[in-house]
């Protein structure tokens, strides 16, 4: 079975994403966000766009959304997804660093098994302000209106929080669900 690719967007938790997947016995490989899309398309069964400081340092990661593979965008990965598909991001009113209670508005294969409210770990200053056409807002919080969104037809999923951090309650379930999506 092909691995999942974790795209390194220069974020502080990207190696923790890789470590979490490997600890779960999910084959995964870290790649640069400058890896040519054709190479990515041949080598994996799904993509995790990791976090990072700015869209300007996201390399060619937005091109990976057009490969027909399932994609999970985490933090900056969510912002890459939103802007590449016609949405918008802005500086958050308060930003988020620490524990946040997220409310799930709509269930989805990525969020299968989670309760309607859950504790997650946030580490961001920007947020999605306009959800792209074809996407559904799945979750929000008191500090961030779009905590999760998805384009079910394209198998594109984005979350603002960090499931790889131990402070996110049951964060591994999200990776388990994404692995299942990539195995369908």
Swiss-Prot record:
It catalyses: XMP + L-glutamine + ATP + H2O = GMP + L-glutamate + AMP + diphosphate + 2 H(+). Catalyzes the synthesis of GMP from XMP. Residues 3-184 form the Glutamine amidotransferase type-1 domain. One of its GO terms (cellular component) is cytosol. GO terms for molecular function: ATP binding; GMP synthase activity. This is GMP synthase [glutamine-hydrolyzing] subunit A. Keywords: ATP-binding, Glutamine amidotransferase, GMP biosynthesis, Ligase, Nucleotide-binding, Purine biosynthesis. The active site is at residues 75, 162, 164. It comes from Methanoculleus marisnigri (strain ATCC 35101 / DSM 1498 / JR1). Gene3D superfamilies: 3.40.50.880. The keyword Flavoprotein does not apply. CDD domains: GATase1_GMP_Synthase (cd01742). Pathway: Purine metabolism; GMP biosynthesis; GMP from XMP (L-Gln route): step 1/1. Its EC number is 6.3.5.2. Heterodimer composed of a glutamine amidotransferase subunit (A) and a GMP-binding subunit (B). It comes from the Archaea.
């Amino acid at each position: 079975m092909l691995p999942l690719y974790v795209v390194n967007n220069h974020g502080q938790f990207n190696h923790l994403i890789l470590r979490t997947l490997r600890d779960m016995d999910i084959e995964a490989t870290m790649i640069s966000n400058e890896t040519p899309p054709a190479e990515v398309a041949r080598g994996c069964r799904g993509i995790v766009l990791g976090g990072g400081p700015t869209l300007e340092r996201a390399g060619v990661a937005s091109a990976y959304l057009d490969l027909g593979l399932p994609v999970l965008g985490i933090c900056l990965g969510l912002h890459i997804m939103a802007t590449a598909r016609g949405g918008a991001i802005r500086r958050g009113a308060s930003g988020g660093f620490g524990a946040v209670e997220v409310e799930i508005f709509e269930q989805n294969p990525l969020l299968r098994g989670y309760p309607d409210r859950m504790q997650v770990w946030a580490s961001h200053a920007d947020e999605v302000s306009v959800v792209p056409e074809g996407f559904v807002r799945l979750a929000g919080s008191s500090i961030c209106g779009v905590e999760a969104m998805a384009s079910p037809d394209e198998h594109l999923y984005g979350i603002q929080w960090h499931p790889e951090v131990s402070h996110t309650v049951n964060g591994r379930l999200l990776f388990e669900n994404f692995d299942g999506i990539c195995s369908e």
